[in-house]
């Protein structure tokens, strides 16, 4: 069969395997690449290659992650797999590997285990929107009733964490058997399960909304005055687009927001009619004094984001080896929170029953900032102390 070339026309999604240690995440990842390689949709990647995940650094945190890519008839996927449990936690909290959906791998022989639960909870907290389940190792289970029982348990667990447990596709198979066979046909006793899984991923996980289609937001990095023209703010457009003549809202660093009109957009010293997600631009703002705008604020579509001081977050605390703290911290701890372009002091409140947080822990916490910031669910931040990063977090809910 002729080798399929990489068609850029296919929509792209980011997915990953999650689940308890030794339930077969990496074997499944290898089996997917092996199966799809038979039809030119992937380069077969061995278990060993995926398992020796290279170290990456995201916001100063060391994470081991493996990336493979493959395509089905309709889509192109980038797939992440992590060797260690801690790597998943760091990945999900820092957003190093943003997932549009994930494949939860559960061993049919063992059923849901502590990390199964933790990965589902983290997916809920950090906003992984869709989960497809692969019940693995069915070659080790003789009793069909046991399979039903495990499926029921998994569905209940998903529902408990507010995923649609009754509607989520649950596929069954043996990643190892499919990998060992490797014929990749839909008729094969073992390889067909990999195809069933990919069909479910294709149909159940929807295409993500593109950044450019979301409401406009640009973190302000710098502000200056152009004599005779007015105040210019510069920054990189995070999402959406802005056209000359659009009304925008200045949000953050103050209780009140301020609406103004964008009267000019320029990039690389050229004037534009509009700018969109990913562009580094300068925006001219009508009637705004230079003293009214500062780094740390954002320009946004009016009404799309509010300045807030109180929110809940899921946080990973760096280990001493990662350059973090050497000692635990307690409730009432007052570090700096770095959002987008600026540091703001905040006070940490730990959940009931949690006395202290050790380096290397991940924890849910409530945070009260001393200055309002434009905050929304899913926003990532770093926790800093004396200029060094000691934690990474993601906003899970707002306390207005």
UniProtKB/Swiss-Prot annotation:
Mg(2+) binds at residue 26. Residues 10-209 form the tr-type G domain. Monomer. InterPro entries: EF-Tu_GTP-bd, EF-Tu_GTPase, EFTu-like_2, EFTU_2, G_TR_CS, P-loop_NTPase, Small_GTP-bd, T_Tr_GTP-bd_dom. Residues 19-26 are annotated as: G1. Residues 174-176 are annotated as: G5. It is found in: Cytoplasm. Residues 81-84 are annotated as: G3. Residues 136-139 are annotated as: G4. It is an enzyme of class 3 (hydrolase). Belongs to the TRAFAC class translation factor GTPase superfamily. Classic translation factor GTPase family. EF-Tu/EF-1A subfamily. GTP hydrolase that promotes the GTP-dependent binding of aminoacyl-tRNA to the A-site of ribosomes during protein biosynthesis. GO terms for molecular function: GTP binding; GTPase activity; translation elongation factor activity. Its main location: cytoplasm. Gene3D superfamilies: P-loop containing nucleotide triphosphate hydrolases, Translation factors. It catalyses: GTP + H2O = GDP + phosphate + H(+). This is Elongation factor Tu 2. Residues 60-64 are annotated as: G2. Its EC number is 3.6.5.3. Pfam families: GTP_EFTU, GTP_EFTU_D2, GTP_EFTU_D3.
